[in-house]
């Protein structure tokens, strides 16, 4: 069992039955944690693996710029999506794509202000989401330059 699988199983058990938990696919927590680990490799930080019964309040990382980051990971990462009814808590939103190899690849990112202005759509689960197509995201190299410049 990998560290991701171990912590994903613990998170799934911790959040089972919670109103805010939306496991829309098999291995939902594993997919999300894989994206967080990949972003952690990108920025030189470990994901926060502490048990948080109330969730992470929409913030996965605080990078050296003191900007907060929320990583959104999907198997089919056509769009960066964020549930429209939830507050946009992070400064930066990153899209990661989870592959058949159980690894995640970082796709791109946007500022909170851009996501706040994004169109809203229900992608078939009865939940309205703000979304930005992956082609419209900023390149990860740009975010990397911003992070590393301030270290």
Report the location of each language-model feature:
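Nucleic-acid endonuclease domains
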Residues: 1-65, 71-151
């Amino acid at each position: 069992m990998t560290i991701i699988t171990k912590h994903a199983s613990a998170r799934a058990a911790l959040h089972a039955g919670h109103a805010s938990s939306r496991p829309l696919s098999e291995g939902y927590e594993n997919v999300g944690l894989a994206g967080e680990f990949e972003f952690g490799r990108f920025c030189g930080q470990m994901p926060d693996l502490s048990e948080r019964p109330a969730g992470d309040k929409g913030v996965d990382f605080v990078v050296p710029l003191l900007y907060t980051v929320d990583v959104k990971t999907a198997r089919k990462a056509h769009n960066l999506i964020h549930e429209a009814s939830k507050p946009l808590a992070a400064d930066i939103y990153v899209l990661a794509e989870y592959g058949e190899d159980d690894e995640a690849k970082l796709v791109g990112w946007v500022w909170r202000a851009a996501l706040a202005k994004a169109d809203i759509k229900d992608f078939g689960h009865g939940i309205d989401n703000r979304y930005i197509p992956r082609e419209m995201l900023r390149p990860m190299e740009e975010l990397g330059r911003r992070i590393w410049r301030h270290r």
